[in-house]
């Protein structure tokens, strides 16, 4: 759940932008059939099993349209929900309920889908020391929602933005003239409290990263045999992250290597939505 400062400064402007995108000048369909205020109620129903996430954002869509809208929740973020389950009732002006329906559901379906998919992957890491991380491969202007959803699903957030930590990827290394030079420059520039992570693609780069004193070494798109050799080279001198081609099918083999982190862009860019709907709208 977002605190009030985050909600007002960071979340509300994004929701308002989404509402402006959808409503523009008016909701011509609603205004065609509802010319006067009329109080109503509608049910929020889950249409498949999953992990619910984004209830605060769902509610905020309606209250930004009309502060008198009330939502009665029967579940909370992180709960496992079942197909057909009644999760909430929304009370308010029917025009508000109709105007906000699609935007509210878009957020809730997307966030719940990410939480559900993350939960299924995180379950495969239980009993191991390996932590599941997301990436910055998020939908533009939706990172605050998508990374929150990863946490609700049982994953962990990697960098939120470029200010959060030093990650030297292939192009940084190329621009600097090599792994050792890149790490040395980062150590000189970045505050000492910031860890320095280096992305490596082969065993020679692994050796350079270790010798340069990198705090975290990311093994990117390496074969299983290469990763086994890399772990021997690193030998506890740095934390190890694995990224690239991470699937539910191969994740057990990755944890067997003893890596500290597994990062997956799929948590945010490939998670399917959770099917949720607003049904049974009626006047009260």
Q: Regions from the language model: what does each represent?
A:
Residues 221, 244, 265-266:
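Short secondary-structure boundary segments
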Residues 236-239, 281-284:
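Short acidic, glycine/proline-enriched helix-loop-strand junctions
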Residues 2-212, 216, 228-233, 239-241, ...:
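Acidic/glycine-rich phosphate/pyrophosphate-binding loops and surrounding catalytic core
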Residues 272-281:
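Structured adenosyl-cofactor binding patch, chiefly the S-adenosyl-L-methionine
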Residues 241-243, 278:
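Short glycine/threonine-rich catalytic loop with a Thr-x-Gly-x-Asp
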């Amino acid at each position: 759940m977002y605190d009030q400062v985050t909600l007002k400064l960071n979340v509300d402007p994004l929701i308002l932008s989404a509402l402006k995108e959808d409503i523009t000048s008016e909701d011509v369909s609603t205004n065609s059939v509802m010319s006067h205020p009329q109080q109503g109620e509608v049910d929020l129903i889950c249409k498949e099993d999953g992990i619910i996430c984004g209830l605060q954002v769902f509610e905020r869509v309606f209250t930004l349209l009309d502060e008198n809208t009330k939502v009665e929740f029967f579940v909370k973020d992180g709960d496992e929900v079942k197909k057909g389950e009644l999760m909430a009732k929304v009370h308010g002006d029917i025009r508000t309920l109709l105007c906000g329906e699609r935007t509210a559901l878009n957020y809730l379906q997307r966030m719940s889908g990410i939480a559900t998919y993350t939960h299924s992957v995180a379950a495969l890491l239980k009993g191991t020391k390996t932590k599941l991380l997301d990436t910055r491969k998020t939908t533009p202007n939706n990172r605050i929602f998508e990374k929150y959803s990863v946490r609700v699903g049982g994953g962990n957030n990697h960098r939120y933005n470029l200010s959060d930590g030093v990650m030297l990827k292939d192009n940084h290394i190329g621009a600097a003239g090599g792994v050792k030079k890149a790490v040395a420059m980062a150590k000189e520039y970045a505050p000492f409290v910031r860890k320095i992570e280096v992305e490596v693609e082969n065993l020679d780069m692994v050796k350079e990263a270790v010798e340069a004193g990198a705090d975290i070494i990311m093994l990117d798109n390496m074969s299983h045999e290469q990763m086994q050799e890399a772990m021997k080279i690193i030998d506890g001198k740095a934390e190890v992250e694995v990224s690239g081609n991470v699937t539910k099918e191969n994740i057990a083999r990755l944890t067997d290597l003893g890596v500290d982190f597994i990062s997956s862009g799929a948590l945010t860019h490939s998670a399917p939505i959770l099917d949720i709907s607003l049904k049974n709208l009626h006047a009260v």
